[in-house]
Amino acid sequence: MKMLLLLHCLGVFLSCSGHIQDEHPQYHSPPDVVIPVRITGTTRGMTPPGWLSYILPFGGQKHIIHIKVKKLLFSKHLPVFTYTDQGAILEDQPFVQNNCYYHGYVEGDPESLVSLSTCFGGFQGILQINDFAYEIKPLAFSTTFEHLVYKMDSEEKQFSTMRSGFMQNEITCRMEFEEIDNSTQKQSSYVGWWIHFRIVEIVVVIDNYLYIRYERNDSKLLEDLYVIVNIVDSILDVIGVKVLLFGLEIWTNKNLIVVDDVRKSVHLYCKWKSENITPRMQHDTSHLFTTLGLRGLSGIGAFRGMCTPHRSCAIVTFMNKTLGTFSIAVAHHLGHNLGMNHDEDTCRCSQPRCIMHEGNPPITKFSNCSYGDFWEYTVERTKCLLETVHTKDIFNVKRCGNGVVEEGEECDCGPLKHCAKDPCCLSNCTLTDGSTCAFGLCCKDCKFLPSGKVCRKEVNECDLPEWCNGTSHKCPDDFYVEDGIPCKERGYCYEKSCHDRNEQCRRIFGAGANTASETCYKELNTLGDRVGHCGIKNATYIKCNISDVQCGRIQCENVTEIPNMSDHTTVHWARFNDIMCWSTDYHLGMKGPDIGEVKDGTECGIDHICIHRHCVHITILNSNCSPAFCNKRGICNNKHHCHCNYLWDPPNCLIKGYGGSVDSGPPPKRKKKKKFCYLCILLLIVLFILLCCLYRLCKKSKPIKKQQDVQTPSAKEEEKIQRRPHELPPQSQPWVMPSQSQPPVTPSQSHPQVMPSQSQPPVTPSQSQPRVMPSQSQPPVMPSQSHPQLTPSQSQPPVTPSQRQPQLMPSQSQPPVTPS
């Protein structure tokens, strides 16, 4: 076995001659002609948002595929480098349509794979269904959306002359000799099953032979390259690797290295790319695509070369391959870059052979050995892959037009088509006439924002605001409250956040959850496993000391429901003496942040907080800045400077002013004046409402003052009249106010009661007048009518017993009545 391995290590360095192959890809089985049918739902329910579903009838049955648009497949401004006839480098940034590349699965097959592109008039890509791979592409000139589906033959005879090679050095071979006896253990090890999410930024170089094969058609070449990258990304996605096309170079005139010998070609290409590609743009690996034959090899890649500038490379041949088989070959050699060996007989996957088999079959699945190799290499040696595209510099060479403002530039609007729409910046990286800025939080409509304009608001009680200074487009740096300042009930500000155990439990398990008792922390965080620990070192969980148990994993209680968790998150439940403890685990393969770790700055006792999984005294955060230093009129920021309250000025909050700090920019000075104006406006509105109410009251009371009120009988007297009407005096006469002037009347006359200002005409004895309302006409009444009792203050002349006088309301006028 060792002898075979030695021959293998030496064999990859043998020279391999190559020549131009002008052969077209060959399919080994007739295609099925299918018409994809779009559906809106399946037998298992409606299609979820963002997913599309199609029926593809081929292979004797109907397949339902579900696909979704991919994100982060190409660099935002993909650079494409070409050469002039004189050898000068040209750069272009072509438009790349990024909403037509899909990934998905086949309904009913959980291990299926679908990778399709719809950018060029139909489906183009591969499908892995029930251990068989298929390639699909549109039927040329079809008017009915017809497609051709080819089965990618995986028989051994097809690939008997097409092997894979990888470049190793003596150290790598020696390591394999040492590990060869552990192959049995290796086959059952799935330590690589959980892996961190990684981004491989790849630069592709097209050699002149492949460029000629595409008849120098740049557009067609780019179309196929985008499809290849989409397929490779889908294949590597199952191990948590994202492939990002970061750049492209085409050798338009001639090959810049000699590609005719395996050993020399790979070394020459790795050296060339480290001297030419690396200075132009940062990347993780670079592959050279060619049509030259490599003595029966599908390509050759540097083993464990990722993140090493002079070794992160590979050469892959396009000779006699379809897009599907070539994409699988690229993924195979990327696997070598990521530390994967060729599969041995003891390696297994769900198919007879796996993608890292030496024969490079059209299979998309990785074996247990590949997972182990990948994990062993990448866990400590490929930290460059953990950085996202947003944390890396795309271009290392400073130049105008790259969209990055560099030294000597006033602005940079990027490509010409973007500059044409920019009102503030010109294509030569200078400002337009009349503009003072082109970007920044303190720039609006090509002008600086005025002094005191807030450019970054505080987001919580541990944050501080910043204001523009009126002379720059930049907003001051983001400052926040000094670490260790108390917040909420028992918390402390730490790095712009106020962490609280109860809130952390509620974020994980929902409303009602609270931090658990001390028992849960002691019992679980001292285990030193995925459920409870105080950190990870060298892939080993660290047990918490008793003094640090509050700073390990968060432990919760009062959990009534288990919410949906992210991938690979497991909820753990335990009981200790009728105490329920709830928590989440963490393993080395989780892609996102650990929601279950106790955050730094969380309280772990009186005057103690958690820092780096240890419970320390709060005095460790002390500085020369304190509330007393700010004269208790402000608070310290993370630069240990006073951020003064309103009405006081920095640096020490001793002088009257408008607040802020020496770091935050000048706060607005019109705040008090505005408040006074608002108060005046409010008072005026209230005064206006009061005047309106007073006016309406006066208007209603005016007619009442013009009328003379008649004093009505008291309630007691009214009740007396109603209860004993037969006891009225023989002569019932109205009472008159003392100031009344009453003319004499005859015994037969009947007089109504009148107010002092009234004049009463004489009436005949038979005249009888009823009680009427003002302005009413008085009909005659019988003499037997009774009269209301009058107040004692009135004086009344004598009348006859037959006289009955009705009471009249004020302002009534009594006309004379003739005797009946």
From Swiss-Prot:
InterPro entries: ADAM_Cys-rich (IPR006586), Disintegrin_CS (IPR018358), Disintegrin_dom (IPR001762), Disintegrin_dom_sf (IPR036436), MetalloPept_cat_dom_sf (IPR024079), Peptidase_M12B (IPR001590), Peptidase_M12B_N (IPR002870), Reprolysin_adamalysin (IPR034027). Residues 696-820 are cytoplasmic. Expressed specifically in testes. Residues 1-18 form the signal peptide. Changing residue 257 to F: In a cutaneous metastatic melanoma sample; somatic mutation; increases the adhesion of melanoma cells to collagens I and IV. GO terms for cellular component: external side of plasma membrane; plasma membrane; sperm head plasma membrane. SMART domains: ACR, DISIN. Residues 715-727 have a biased composition (Basic and acidic residues). The chain crosses the membrane at residues 675-695. Residues 625-654 form the EGF-like domain. Changing residue 31 to L: In a colorectal cancer sample; somatic mutation. Residues 706-820 are annotated as: Disordered. Changing residue 305 to E: In a cutaneous metastatic melanoma sample; somatic mutation. Residues 739-819 are annotated as: 9 X 9 AA approximate repeats. May be involved in spermatogenesis and fertilization. Seems to be a non catalytic metalloprotease-like protein. It is linked to Has been found to be frequently mutated in melanoma. ADAM7 mutations may play a role in melanoma progression and metastasis. This is Disintegrin and metalloproteinase domain-containing protein 29. It comes from Homo sapiens. The gene is ADAM29.
